[in-house]
Amino acid sequence: MSDKAAFERGTDGPKVIVAGLDGSESSWRAAAYAAGLARRQRALLAIVYVQPVLAAGAAFGAPVAEATAEIADELKAEIEKAASRFQSVSSLRWEFHTFTGDPFSGLSQASDELKADAVVVGASEKAGHRIVGSVAVRLVKAGRWPVTVVP
């Protein structure tokens, strides 16, 4: 009975790792952790920023779409700057994606569309999430991907 597939060293890890990034300190730590994991597993790192549908600036007449697009551009520029510093020592494959919606729905959509094998997010820094539930808790409860929460 040699029909069983033989174990191949280095081929059983995740192929796509999604990291949620919103600019908070914990999300940057999560992205760094995910980058290390992706590098070691030779996986694709998909960094995802979810643009909010409504922002506080909308109440004051600020152009919300332009503001959130600007945030996405700034995050991407910071990521590219960090990646260029390590390019000579690492062959990390990464992509930057933006999705629109609330963070849970956006990360869920991204993880589904990108066929994520794992999702990495930062721990919530907002006090209200103790009552409503953080994005990380909601992703875990969805039970569709392994989720790592980085403090």
Residues covered by each model-derived region:
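Short, acidic/small-residue loops that bind anionic groups at enzyme active sites
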Residues: 142-151
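Short secondary-structure boundary segments
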Residues: 49, 122-124, 151
